[in-house]
Amino acid sequence: MINPIAFKLGPLSLHWYAVCILVGLLLAVYLAAKEAPRKKMTSDDIIDFILIAFPLAIIGARIYYVAFEWSYYSQHLSDIFAIWNGGIAIYGGLITGTIVLFVYCYYKVLNPIHFLDIAAPSVMLAQAIGRWGNFFNQEAYGKAVSQLNYLPSFIRQQMFIDGSYRVPTFLYESMWNLIGFVIIMVWRRKPRSLLDGDILSFYLIWYGCGRLVIEGMRTDSLMLLGIRVSQYVSVLLIVIAIVFIFKRHRQKGISYYQE
């Protein structure tokens, strides 16, 4: 088993979970800042937004998780703040971040669809990296299986939990996001085939479909009325994206890059 603590400095500990999130964040900011000028925005617009949105998104992700696990946290109130042990919900962070984005764009007089188009591939890459935090914390895994011989030994060993090998759903989602990121980056090199909002819509559909399937493999899902909450949200995002694409293309929307 890999120690979930990356290193200690006196009384302070830095967990691998946090390292994965921070590495994903830094790469996401770099990519978004690089793309911003092509969408009539500046790198400062991106950085200023991240400084506001990131801490709020983490809080939102934690609130989302705690809300659906309230039966536990109501009896362990001090654990609500133990975020280093895991327990942040990606959808909670995405919802919070999107709300902050619309407010930010309103006050900065920016086009939120442009911003979301820029953010989509960066977020997808950050998610691909961030999922490895679940690996180090031994969470977000699936059912017990007899063997995992198709995986490298370090993953097999870390996925040996409670006396059994577990389906590495974190890995499936990480790879799914990475593939989606590559598709977007290749597709974005052909802007004539893109309309404003297409990258955002692709992200919602791609991530939503992957999460819908992979969530069904997990054994630690947040539940609502007997159905996994993330599957509810995934279906909703897919429907929203399809409707958005249909309307955008039917109305002959604005090209992805404007001259």
From Swiss-Prot:
Keywords: Cell membrane, Membrane, Transferase, Transmembrane, Transmembrane helix. Its EC number is 2.5.1.145. It comes from the Bacteria. The chain crosses the membrane at residues 12-32, 46-66, 83-103, 109-129, 167-187, 194-214, 226-246. One of its GO terms (molecular function) is phosphatidylglycerol-prolipoprotein diacylglyceryl transferase activity. A 1,2-diacyl-sn-glycero-3-phospho-(1'-sn-glycerol) binds at residue 131. Disulfide bonds: none annotated. GO terms for cellular component: plasma membrane. GO terms for biological process: lipoprotein biosynthetic process. Pathway: Protein modification; lipoprotein biosynthesis (diacylglyceryl transfer). It is found in: Cell membrane. It is a multi-pass membrane protein. NCBIfam families: lgt (TIGR00544). This is Phosphatidylglycerol--prolipoprotein diacylglyceryl transferase. It comes from Streptococcus equi subsp. zooepidemicus (strain MGCS10565).
